[in-house]
């Protein structure tokens, strides 16, 4: 499909450029020993999570629904932070992933 034929509004992601950027981040991880996580608030295009998961260590989430999305679509480390949690949310976060950092 030609870009001129796209119906707008829409998001167009250049996967070649995305892979280039992810490769840079992966090199930073390797060179420094740090972990780089995808901030889902900044980029929540979950269609690309399997690709991103090939390069990064996981996701950050600000609550239960983002944590679930990160687990289901990327399946890697999941860092969750919110100023407060409901008891039911804590229970479900534990069920989503035992490795979640809350």
Mark where each language-model region is.
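Generic N-terminal amphipathic, Lys/Arg-enriched alpha-helix
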Residues: 1-13
